[in-house]
Amino acid sequence: ESGAVVHLQGIARDTTDEISDFMEAASAAGVDLILSSAGVSVGEYDFVKAAISTHGKIDFWRVNLRPGKPLAFGQYRTIPFFGLPGNPVSSFVTFLLFVQPAIQKMCGLVNDPSRRLSAYLQQPVQSDGRESYLRAHAHLSPDGDIHAQLAGSHQGSANLLGLVASNALLIVPSGVKSLPIGARVDLLLIGDLTNE
């Protein structure tokens, strides 16, 4: 869907040496981009930063985003590198926002602007003030307006059920802590728009 041909390396154990070996194998395979998931935060088993630094650099490793704060970007040797968060929803969101556009640009493809829509919110939404991408369900009403509500019981970054039940990510801009019912919001479609 993004335009890339995947060269799967498999799963590395949580050691700097094994992660470095995987990076070397990717480099030797002649890939144009290295992508990893997990191991980019600051926990006891997060060794990606150390592995990259042996033959590369990290340009940034955090973004002010929910979900998806631990996101790394840099180079391994001369190859661009993205390190996605380990939580599945965080990984999904950061892939859509950062990695997919990079792959499409590298392939000479254009991002599809029709995936961004405006909708009317059907429930109040609270946020912590960070730019947030909340799992939502969007539908087209008989009057032609698009309406959206949150999907799933909570927005935790490990909640896959909410992601499966959603067809859109509801975008809460940075600095916004609450949105009332009826507020006009931006959406990023991740599935098909449904009818009411």
Q: How should these model regions be labeled?
A:
Residues 11, 36-37, 83, 94:
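Small/polar loops that bind or transfer phosphate-bearing groups
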Residues 4, 11-14, 39-40, 57, ...:
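Short, ordered loop/turn segments at secondary-structure junctions
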Residues 19, 42-45, 91-92:
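Short glycine/serine/threonine-rich phosphate/pyrophosphate-binding segments
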Residues 1-36:
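Phosphate-binding glycine-rich loops and their immediate beta-loop-alpha structural context
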Residues 27, 46, 63:
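Catalytic core of soluble alpha/beta enzymes
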Residues 31-48, 85:
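Glycine-rich beta-strand-to-loop/alpha-helix junction loops that act as flexible
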Residues 53-196:
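Flexible glycine/proline-rich
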